[in-house]
Amino acid sequence: MADNQIPITQIEDGTVKQPSVWRNLLIDGLWKNNGALVQLLGLCPLLAVSNSVTNALGLGLATLFVLLCTNVTISLFRQMIPHDIRIPIYVMVIATVVTAVQLLMNAFAYPVYQSLGIFIPLIVTNCIVIGRAEAYASKHQVHHSAFDGLATGLGMTLSLVLLGAIRELIGNGTLFDGLDLLFGDWAKVLRLDLLQLDSGLLLAILPPGAFIGLGLILAVKNLFDHK
């Protein structure tokens, strides 16, 4: 079935029932068509910054915000954007939103901004963002496009956080360390010391550990999909 097509089902009284568009968008974004775990898009930031939950959540929320704003903007002006130059226009819209996100993180979450570094502006080139703009937002109404951006962003964020949690736990024995850098001093109480390690497995927080962790997550997801 083509991406984003809504299946039509027959019910007992002979009428045709169309499943909820919202439900399908949510399931696609979180599981069936997850940008990171199914389409394998945006792997560069996914692998590079997911060495802790804090970094993963910071980049995930930034990407979610960019997806949401970009989808809404492009859907609003979809009838006015010339078809022949639509891609450069999409990139300009994405770059504008990313610049705003970068300035906000610089002002309110500077340590995380420093930690993520170049990967915040690189959201501009993330294929997930421009892919949803081209495949969905440019063809659908604003409310559906906004929810598509939200669902896709949540799927990306959850993938990042899951990989970050695995790597942080194995590498440092902790979870949610440094979350106060994102949410303030109150978040210090969320830190969990789950494994009492004198020295964690360094491989887990290095790039090879990211590939191994992602491979394990993909294997588990495929196992569930084929049951």
Swiss-Prot record:
EC number of the protein: 7.-.-.-
Q: Which UniProt keywords apply?
A: Cell inner membrane, Cell membrane, Electron transport, Membrane, Translocase, Transmembrane, Transmembrane helix, Transport
Q: Output the GO biological process annotations, alphabetical, semicolon-separated.
A: electron transport chain
InterPro entries in the record, alphabetically? NqrDE/RnfAE, RnfE
Localization (cell)? Cell inner membrane
Q: How does it sit in the membrane?
A: Multi-pass membrane protein
Tell me the enzyme class: translocase
- Write out the GO cellular component annotations: plasma membrane
Membrane spanning residue stretches:
57-77, 89-109, 111-131, 146-166, 200-220
Per the similarity annotation, which family is this?
Answer: Belongs to the NqrDE/RnfAE family.
* SUBUNIT field: The complex is composed of six subunits: RnfA, RnfB, RnfC, RnfD, RnfE and RnfG.
What NCBIfam families does UniProt report for this protein, alphabetically?
Answer: PRK12405.1, rnfE
Job of this protein: Part of a membrane-bound complex that couples electron transfer with translocation of ions across the membrane.
> What's this protein's name?
Ion-translocating oxidoreductase complex subunit E
Gene that produces this protein: rnfE
